A protein has these predicted regions:
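Periplasmic-binding protein-like
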Residues: 117-124, 180-183, 217, 238-248, ...
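Flexible loop/hinge segments that line or gate small-molecule binding clefts
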Residues: 124-166, 186, 209-210, 250, ...
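Hinge/beta->alpha junction and helix N-cap segments in small-molecule ligand-binding domains
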Residues: 51, 69-78, 96-105, 156-166, ...
């Protein structure tokens, strides 16, 4: 049996081949009724779009890259799942690259890995600086995740400073006064850790609590062993916190282990809150309070924005009336309060 073609879909739907093409390419000017009729015809006949041919005609590969520091960090694995799902809905394939938080790898990603294989890149940088983004040509189109490094770049994130302020307020509202920030960084950088530390400091100031730089517990990376080591070291050196703000859930889960080994009860003696709402925090003992970013929204906004930039970059001359200014998109977050701060899970 011959494969159905566009003209077969058009005949079945009672429309022109051009209208079928417009529906396939998701042009906005097609009426909802016509769009529905054409899609029903496509489903009935089993018509399949030749994606490779369509992409090549438009000067595209149909492939985007997602570049994250480490895939075995649960937040990035969960984010990748959402990005893949969102891209599939737009007939895009996702190539996942692990940068290892290495500046050379992140710079290579910004340059499109030295090839035209990918149409655009979603990049979560940890090592790049604002200077690294200066003088970019805009090719390949790139959307940054995390903190805004440079005003001229498209960017999607939660409001990390506000989220950390809210999490610290929650701890203070429980009557905690000796709040340590695990992974906190008190420098002038523009990264996520610095933004969350600013939020932590702002909440202390609001409550009239003094800020002590020694309350920032440095970590080598944002993994469970690093959180455990940082908290164990602080306790061994005589620190007596009654709360921990951990800059991600991996650090928080490590902190829970260290507190347990030192005979410290959670949350009776020390309340603990993390960031990211990864699956492991829902099954830890106690379950972990956390800041939950809307990961699905981060993925959706990032893919939408990148697709728009790709269309701008590959459109024929005169087909785009004006290039949209760089976008700084903030997506929602919420506090999820569980046993590690409340003693029970809030429903």
């Amino acid at each position: 049996v011959a494969r159905p073609r566009i003209k077969d879909v058009a005949r079945h739907a009672g429309v022109s081949e051009k209208t079928v093409s417009n529906v396939i390419n998701d042009y906005a000017h097609v009426s909802d009724r016509t769009r529905q009729v054409v899609r029903e015809a496509i489903d009935h006949l089993g018509y399949r779009v030749n994606l490779a041919g369509r992409h090549l005609r438009k000067g595209r590969t149909g492939i985007i890259a997602l570049v994250v520091p480490e895939l075995d960090i649960p937040y990035f694995a969960e984010l990748a799942r959402h990005v893949i799902r969102e891209a599939e809905q737009r007939s895009l394939t996702v190539l996942i690259h692990q940068s290892g938080a290495d500046r050379a790898h992140e710079l290579a990603a910004l340059a499109g890995f030295g090839s035209t294989f990918v149409d655009g890149i979603i990049l979560s940088p940890l090592a790049l600086t604002a200077d690294d983004l200066q003088g970019r040509t805009g090719f390949p189109p790139t959307v940054l995740l995390g903190e805004l490094l440079e005003e001229g770049a498209d960017h999607v994130a939660i409001d990390n400073e506000r989220a950390a302020r809210e999490a610290t307020r929650h701890l203070i509202g429980l009557g905690r006064r000796a709040v340590l920030a695990v992974g906190g960084r008190d420098d002038s950088g523009l990264g996520t850790a610095q933004a969350r530390t600013r939020g932590y400091r702002a909440a202390l100031a609001e409550a009239g609590l003094p800020y002590d730089p020694a309350a920032l517990l440095p970590v080598g990376s944002f993994r469970m062993p690093d959180g455990a080591r940082a908290v164990s070291r602080a306790l061994a050196e005589g620190a007596r916190p009654d709360a921990l703000l951990c800059l991600n859930d991996q650090l928080a889960l490590g902190a829970l282990r260290a507190l347990h080994e030192h005979g410290v009860r959670v949350p009776e003696d020390v309340a603990v809150i993390g960031f990211d709402d990864v699956e492991g925090g829902r099954f830890s003992v106690p379950t972990l309070s956390t800041v939950a970013p809307d990961k699905a929204a981060v993925a959706k906004v990032a893919v939408q924005l990148l697709q728009h930039r790709i269309e701008e970059a590959t459109a024929p001359d005169g087909a785009v009336s004006g290039v949209q200014a760089p976008q700084d998109r903030i997506v929602a977050h919420r506090l999820v309060l569980r046993e590690s701060t409340e003693g029970h899970e809030r429903r």
